[in-house]
Amino acid sequence: MMNTYFQQVNRYLTMVAQQESEQINRVAQLIVKRLVQGGIIQLFGSGHSMLLAQECYFRAGGLVPVKPIHIESLMLHQGARQSSQNEKKQAFLAPYKDELQFDDKDVCIIISTSANNPVPIDMAIYAKEAGAHTISLQSLAYQQQPSRHPSGQRLEDIADDVLNTHVPLGDGVLTVDEFQYGPVSTVLGAALLNALCAQIIEILHEQGASLPVFASSNLGNTNNDELIDQYGQRDSFLRP
């Protein structure tokens, strides 16, 4: 089954590359316009989706102006069941609204495979209210799953743009008897996000703009201090 899993991952990655490349490029162009104006990319997810919000952060070869939004009661290390339950609670995010730091030049990528829970939907609403451009990273395979938000809207109804991961219902790409296993949401989401960042860097290069890209701290005398100082005012975790 191991080889079958790799084959399935390759099949889905090929599907994403073939069907989403135009949208990835369009979204990358939009993000570049905001980055050159001084905006940053903020990413949010709960549970395993938070892993994807952290994937692009402080990453060698990745963009510096990237900031994950941490709400610990929605993260796995504070309790896996709790994070899942909290994501489904109406108005759970409201007490955190004033802590969010969106600028009208920012982009907010909200990550939710199912895209029907109140917390990611509220995050998109709050980001839009602050003037940020909102992008959902989700699987449209779940589009028929009803919203749990009191408005009845799903994440794709709120977000300005959608990036479709094509993750199948139930996440797993393998089955044995009645059991579905072999999840791909993290693999596909990480690949799509890194492809987006790569396209952003390519566009910045084509425009002759400076490239805010982290060099690896494990390869000789690299120094990212200047870039960290530049963006540290927007991200306290980058400060000494």
From Swiss-Prot:
Q: What are the protein's GO molecular function terms?
A: carbohydrate derivative binding
Domain SIS residue range list: 31-206
A GO BP entry is: carbohydrate derivative metabolic process
Which Pfam families does this one have? SIS_2 (PF13580)
Question: What residue stretch is flagged as signal peptide?
Answer: none
What the entry lists under CDD domains is as follows: SIS_RpiR
Alphabetical list of PANTHER family matching this protein? PHOSPHOHEPTOSE ISOMERASE, SEDOHEPTULOSE 7-PHOSPHATE ISOMERASE / DNAA INITIATOR-ASSOCIATING FACTOR FOR REPLICATION INITIATION
Which protein are we looking at?
UPF0309 protein in nagA 3'region
Q: What is the lineage of its organism?
A: Bacteria, Bacillati, Bacillota, Bacilli, Bacillales
